[in-house]
Amino acid sequence: MTEAPHTVKSYEEELKNLNSNIIKMGGFCEEALGKAIQAITTRNSDNAEAVIKDDEKIDKFETLIEQQVVNLIALRQPMAIDLRETVTALKISSDLEIIGDLAKNISKRTLLLNENLPKNLVDAIIRVSSDVQKQLKSILDAYLERSSSMAINVWESDEQIDDLTNLCMQEVIRYLKDNENNLSDGTHLLFVTKNIERIGDHTTNIAEQVYYLVKGEYLEGDRPKGTEPIVTGEK
């Protein structure tokens, strides 16, 4: 049975505004991640400081979206597809806020590094972060286009992110062995790598929500995972 569209024009505008804010928030997260990765791979402190400063914008969007959802549910009492729209927006904004926090943490640790990174380690970070950046862009496009197939592609790519993360971890461990007097930098790099992977995990969370939004049901089966991670991360 086809779900009947709502008829209140102002309500439709409110939903459009909610969707627009999700896309804007996602855009800020994309920008933060890009700057954070550039900061650590090129030791660009200006980019790192910009990510830390601009995280407040992402936090404000989460608060705004949360208030919009509360108002929509309380005043409009949405049903069916409209209820999925509002609930999904709330969950996606939560994941985006965490992605912003993780980008900020990468930037904070970048500012604490004492030495320039060897090329092999920079290359490993770029490989995994490049895939995560593509993943984030793809899922925002999937949300915008209401594409369940794009959401599935992002969901399935999580395994590759895990594997690239562990390759990066191996490079960090090699760096630690070669720089035993610089355990501080090595520790920061382990957490940077794990935070990049966690951004991928939260992007995959968004993929599950987009699929639910479009299909009205959750993805079946266990989330694809790569090899076991070496260390745990942080928010």
Spans of features found by a protein language model:
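Cytosolic, long alpha-helical scaffolding segments
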Residues: 1-235
